[in-house]
Regions:
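Acetyl-CoA-dependent GNAT
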Residues: 14-18, 22-72, 78
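Conserved acetyl-CoA-binding loop of GNAT-fold acetyltransferases
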Residues: 124-134
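Conserved GNAT acetyl-CoA-binding A-motif
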Residues: 96, 103-116
Length: 152
C-alpha cells in the first residue's frame, strides 16, 4: 500500500541523477546515472518527493519502439528507482500507474522495460509479462528480462 499523501509529478532530468546513482548504480561497474534518452524529445521523468522535498522515487518514460511490433507506438520505462528506505511501500506502483496513464495519453500500444531480475516479480504482479530469455545488461552487468504490457 502506498505511503500517504505522496503525489507523482514531472521532474527535470537532473533531479533523477542522485537517486538513480544511489539505487541503480550501487554494486555495478558504473556510477554514471545518465541515459542517452534523457533529453530525447518526448521523454518524461516522473518523481515522488517526501515531506522534506527529497526525491524518494523516480522513473523515466521514453518513446521507443517495442522490438516485436516496431510499427506500433510504444513507451520504454527506464530508471525506475525507489529510495531503499521506501521500497515495498507502494511508491513504485504509483510511478508505474502514472507512467502507464502517460503512455495511454500518447496512444501507446505497449509499455516495456529491461527489468532487473531482482525486480521481475514487481513487474509481473503489475500486469507485465516476461518476454524471451534472460540476459546480462551491458552497463550494470546484472541479469535482466524484457517485460512488456500491452495497453490495447
Amino acid at each position: 500500500m502506498a505511503e500517504p499523501n505522496f503525489q507523482v509529478v514531472k521532474i527535470a532530468t537532473e533531479e533523477t541523477y542522485a537517486l538513480r546513482s544511489a539505487v541503480l548504480r550501487a554494486d555495478t561497474p558504473t556510477s554514471d546515472p545518465k541515459y542517452a534518452e534523457d533529453s530525447k524529445p518526448g521523454t518524461v521523468h516522473l518523481g515522488i518527493f517526501d515531506e522534506n522535498k527529497n526525491l524518494i522515487a523516480t522513473s523515466t518514460w521514453v518513446i521507443n519502439p517495442w522490438q516485436h511490433d516496431s510499427s506500433a507506438m510504444a513507451i520504454q520505462l527506464r530508471g525506475m528507482a525507489v529510495a531503499t528506505n521506501h521500497q515495498k511501500s507502494g511508491l513504485g506502483k504509483l510511478l508505474l500507474d502514472a507512467g502507464i496513464i502517460h503512455a495511454k495519453t500518447l496512444n501507446a500500444k505497449y509499455v516495456w522495460a529491461k527489468a532487473r531480475d531482482s525486480a521481475l516479480d514487481f513487474y509481473l504482479r503489475n500486469n507485465f509479462v516476461s518476454f524471451g530469455d534472460g540476459f546480462t545488461e551491458g552497463v550494470t552487468q546484472m541479469p535482466h528480462h524484457l517485460v512488456v504490457q500491452k495497453l490495447f
